[in-house]
Amino acid sequence: MSNKNLLSGRDKELQELAEQYEAAMAENKPFYQDADELADLADWYGTKKRYDKAFEIAEYGLKLHPDSTELMIEYAYLHLDNGKQAKAREIIENLPDTYSPEAKVVRAHLLLSEGKLDDAEQLLDTIEDKDDLANVVDVSYMYLDMGYPDKALAWLDPVKEEYSDEEAYIAVVADCLYGKGMTEEAIPLYNRLIDMNPYSAPYWFGLAR
């Protein structure tokens, strides 16, 4: 699970999609979306700690799109978030695409949950485009979620000049600094994020912490 869905505009879109999904289920109506939309929706429910709904939408999505790497990865993350490493491993080992950056990040998450830091780092080092913002953000949030903010910053620092004005970059750096206890350094970044997206509850929460 990543925090990409909390960025400006996307959280609201997914809130609306969740309302549509729940209304359709309540009325026993079909609800069709692309695999990536359903994966994002499952992730959105997960970030809200609504895991029953998150699992429900992931499993519903996999019935519609059984070969979707995106949905399988999200399904694996949900199991990892709930301490079900064995099931997560089974899903990860059966991913249709094991070489994508997203597949490597979720496998690294599993390795870290098993205490295999060196193996996780070696795997992440095989990601080809380490300067791609999406890859940097995914890896950084994974490290941060697993309690390694310094490892996250090691991925963030090399691309600082290129992405220092990007909302996604600023958000993960702010969260990493907060994770290291560097609250004073994080506050100006949360203020920048609020200027970019004044209606984002996570940014206000970050500032209030």
Residue positions per predicted region:
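Short coil turns that delineate tetratricopeptide repeat
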Residues: 66, 98-100, 130-132, 163-164, ...
